[in-house]
Design a protein with these regions (language model features):
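Asp-based phosphoryl-transfer active-site loop
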Residues: 6-26, 54
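Mg2+-dependent phosphoryl-transfer enzymes with acidic/Ser/Thr/Gly-rich catalytic loops
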Residues: 8, 34, 165, 170-268
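Active-site phosphate-binding/coordination module
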Residues: 32-119
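Substrate-recognition/cap helix-loop segment adjacent to the acidic, metal-dependent catalytic center
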Residues: 58-75, 133-152
Length: 268
């Protein structure tokens, strides 16, 4: 694959969270954020005139918790949640989800190594602590979705999610690219999981660049070895943009909230 260039001033930057900005952890709530990351994202937001968004499988409130005090434009739950700069979070409703929860809770009771994670309009079953249970999880999800309406399964790294049908990270990126300040820019999306492939396809269709974090088959054009390499590239790009002779004073200021505004992630 070709070498990843530094971020240009005309970039619309889209970043996955887990496995991209942050290293993966045994459980979602145990993820740690590198101390310098928030400052780097703030600088990038300013130098890109606000054209930076986080595109994640997590709920947006959890992203706010990890990245506080920043409240960046974001798409959560693979596009089922959406927030423009400083705006309210809009959600794709999933009324068929609640009847499935008792069946999934019974599965977790039967296999205690599994983790059930509620995500407002989605639910995830994690099997990172017991990879041998992948087939059992897949079969259980297929069974509970048999008569569900408006929901679909989304496999990921040691996880299967049930989310609203017809939304994905590619749709979220395409929606951002139709609005200011993202419109008319060159999109770049970095992600690590199979759930990020629609995002890679979307930026390629729009003439942009997909960046895979890790190594596997992908439609992304460029790859980096892991989250540490991705963060290093972000730091170097932020420094280069801020140091540019033509940079001038930043014109965009990210929306920020006081401590504790983001929801602390939990699993059930």
């Amino acid at each position: 694959m070709p070498q990843l260039p530094l971020i240009e001033p005309n970039t619309a930057l889209f970043l996955d969270f887990d496995g991209t900005l942050a290293d993966l952890a045994p459980r979602p709530e145990l993820v740690q954020i590198e101390p310098e990351l928030v400052g780097t994202l703030r600088t990038l937001y300013q130098r890109l005139d606000g054209a930076l968004a986080v595109i994640s499988g997590r709920p947006i409130l959890e992203l706010d918790h990890f990245l506080q005090p920043l409240q960046l434009p974001a798409a959560g739950i693979h596009g089922a949640e959406f927030r423009t700069d400083g705006g309210m979070v809009s959600k794709t409703h999933a009324p068929g989800l609640e009847p499935l929860i008792p069946h999934l809770e019974a599965l977790v009771r039967a296999y205690p190594a599994l983790r059930l994670e509620r995500k407002s309009v989605a639910v995830a079953i994690h099997y990172r602590q017991a990879p041998e249970l992948a087939g059992i999880v897949d079969a259980a999800v297929t069974d509970v979705l048999r008569h569900a309406v408006g929901l679909e399964a989304l496999p990921g790294k040691m996880v299967v999610e049930i989310k609203p049908a017809g939304v994905d990270k590619g749709d979220a990126i395409a929606a951002f690219m139709k609005t200011a300040p993202f419109a008319e820019r060159v999109p770049l999306f970095a992600g690590d999981d199979m759930t990020d492939e629609p995002g890679f396809a979307a930026v390629r269709k729009l003439g942009g660049l997909g960046v895979l974090v890790g190594q596997r088959e992908t439609v992304a054009a460029v790859s980096v070895p892991g989250p540490a390499a991705l963060r290093s590239w972000l730091h170097r790009s932020a420094h280069a943009l801020a140091s540019s002779a033509s940079a001038g004073a930043p014109r965009a200021v990210p929306h920020e909230a006081g401590p504790g505004r983001g929801r602390r992630p939990t699993t059930s």
